[in-house]
């Protein structure tokens, strides 16, 4: 037994404390998650979905945990100024793994919409949480999900009732704040009832230069004819390790637009599991990764077509420089009954240095005979002819490289449907390529 032993011993010693600062609904699945974690341990690189990242090594250091739920001395509404210009949002904060409730946004939400702490809603309406919490994120199938379920003491709930359409995007800023190296276990539950529409922007930022280890589990339930836009933007620092598992279930004729953007990080491992539960649904999964120095980004996706007449489109692009390492493994599963499936999976990668490495593994697993599916990947370097053309016209080598890299990732950015966010990302990406963006540039906490 390797690094998992410290977490097993930790839970045995502190289970009572963990449960005393949480809700019964979360505690109800905690012991099973512990048993599942003990049985599985951290996945080795022999496990297919984890072959590109050594999870045991990531969890080996001894991080602190705030199990007593000590208050973090911070008012993010005063300190954080990193808003996206012209994007009107309902702004909320999660400090480490706690929903910040002392000051909530003044914008009014439609009747019945809930954006609140999981534990608080679980106390007032436990039935709502019980119907969805840990139903899709099964602890017996994934050790990281089991560890998160075992240790998470609170989380964020977003609930949008039937036929309610949110005019404003919900923006959630996840801030890491600590005076010591810290492990954070974050949980998010999103529920969109039939006909509901909502857009969410999750921004991961760090207020301190400590070492952070974050596990995150997001469960999103998208009802019939509902529409979910989910944007996940990471701008942390090189001392940050982030392991995120996202689970999405789509009912008939629903639509999901999932976007993950990694602009600055240390080590990032993202997993997306999306399943079609009803006919006529469609999803778009896009990813943009910019990594240099010794940064590492691993995206792993599974699109599960269980029913007929559904459409999925994936596009992930990486730009790697210096000694950065990237990995993409995408599997599209088309089951026997999923006739008339339409699926496209693409992973294109630009390796700008000889010392950078990219691993790519797109897969199609098809058991139906009336489908339209395709997948492909490319790994290449900067176009010498294009570089030569620009150099002849007086453009410096550095500027020419920047223009080619920016044009390469622009296809993904242009798919962002929130126009102000799209425009802001154009600026951030250019700054990132110029080396001017080391972490969130608009937060006064960053010193």
Language model features with spans:
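Conserved beta-strand/loop scaffold segments within soluble protein domains that form the structured core
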Residues: 111-116, 124-395, 409, 413-447
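N-terminal amphipathic, basic helical "cap/leader" segment at the start of enzyme domains
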Residues: 1-146, 315, 321
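Extracellular glycan-modifying ectodomains
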Residues: 400
């Amino acid at each position: 037994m390797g690094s998992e032993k410290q977490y097993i011993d930790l839970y045995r010693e502190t289970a009572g404390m963990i449960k005393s600062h949480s809700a019964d609904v979360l505690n109800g699945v905690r012991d099973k998650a512990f048993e599942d974690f003990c049985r599985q341990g951290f996945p080795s690189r022999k496990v297919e979905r984890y072959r590109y990242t050594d999870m045991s090594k990531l969890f080996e250091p001894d991080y602190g945990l705030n199990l007593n739920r000590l208050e973090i001395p911070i008012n993010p509404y005063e300190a954080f100024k990193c808003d996206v210009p012209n994007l009107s949002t309902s702004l909320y904060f999660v400090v480490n793994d706690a929903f910040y409730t002392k000051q909530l946004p003044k914008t009014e939400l439609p009747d019945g919409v809930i954006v609140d702490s999981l534990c608080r809603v679980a106390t007032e309406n436990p039935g709502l949480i019980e119907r969805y919490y840990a139903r899709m994120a099964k602890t017996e199938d994934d050790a990281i999900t089991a560890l998160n379920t075992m240790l998470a003491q609170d989380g964020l709930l977003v609930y949008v009732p039937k036929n309610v359409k949110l005019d404003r995007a919900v923006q959630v800023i996840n801030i890491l704040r600590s005076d010591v190296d810290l492990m954070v276990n974050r949980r998010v539950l999103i529920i969109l009832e039939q006909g509901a529409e909502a857009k969410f922007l999750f921004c991961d930022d760090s207020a301190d230069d400590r070492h952070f280890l974050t596990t995150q589990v997001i469960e999103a339930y998208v009802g019939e004819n509902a529409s979910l836009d989910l944007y996940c933007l990471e701008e942390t620092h090189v001392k940050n390790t982030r392991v995120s598992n996202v689970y999405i279930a789509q009912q008939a004729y629903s639509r999901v637009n999932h976007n993950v953007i990694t602009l600055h990080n240390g080590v990032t491992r993202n997993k997306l599991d999306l399943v079609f539960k009803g006919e006529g649904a469609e999803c778009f999964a896009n990813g943009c990764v910019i990594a240099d120095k010794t940064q590492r980004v691993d995206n792993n996706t599974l699109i599960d077509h269980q029913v007929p007449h559904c459409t999925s489109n994936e596009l992930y692009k990486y730009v790697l420089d210096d000694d950065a390492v990237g990995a993409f493994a995408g599997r599209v599963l088309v089951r026997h009954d999923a006739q008339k499936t339409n699926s496209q999976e693409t992973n294109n990668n630009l390796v700008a240095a000889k010392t950078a490495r990219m691993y790519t593994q797109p897969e199609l697993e098809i058991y139906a005979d009336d489908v339209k599916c395709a997948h492909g990947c490319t790994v290449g370097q900067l176009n010498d002819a294009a570089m030569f053309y620009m150099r002849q016209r007086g453009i410096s080598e550095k500027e020419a490289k920047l223009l080619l890299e920016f044009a390469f990732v622009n296809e993904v950015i242009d798919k962002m449907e929130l126009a102000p966010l799209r425009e802001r990302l154009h600026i951030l990406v250019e700054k990132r390529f110029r080396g001017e963006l080391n972490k969130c540039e608009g937060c006064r906490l960053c010193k």
